[in-house]
Amino acid sequence: LYMLMPDRFANGNPKNDVLKTMRDKNCDRHAPSLRHGGDLEGIRQHLDYFNQLGVTALWFTPVLEIDSPGDGKSSSYHGYATTNYYKVDPRFGTNAEYKRLIDEAHQKGLKIVMDMIFNHCGFEHPWIADMPSKDWFNCPEWLLPEYQTPEHVKKIGTVDGARTVNDMYRQTSYKLTPVLDPYASKVDMEETVDGWFVPSM
């Protein structure tokens, strides 16, 4: 099993790197926190490479659409902030290109594992925009969009120093993803753990 992050693997179609139809217009291979342009076509072009490695299955980080605004500093290149669970992110390709990749992978004896994340989504997803109640999600209040105001940040401090772990995480029966998330931000990792291990891998 070979796990890969499509945005970081290979750019097979530079024309889909920045699209007018998407809110985030940032793509810069020199910026670690921005999109780099890898896509499904880049993976398809390298299927023989995986055969040469002896790989029998590919596990991608999510490739579903993330139409979130970009700030030029960071992006959800990793795929874990879905805004549309029915469509491949056009910066990765199309649903048809995804099907073509799967078909060609199967012809070469490769299986495809799709990473599906239904325990959270992007802030621009309709589930967040139209919540039936304020506590619909198990989410620290400071992460909710209505709390991302200068007044609120002044009140509680910033992530990069003034805020403490107790301000960021509350006691709950749910497992909060930043604690055990291998794709967590540097700030989250510094506030929680130094590594990540899953015995089933």
Regions found by a protein language model. Name each.
Residues 1-10:
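Mature N-terminal segment immediately following signal peptide/propeptide cleavage
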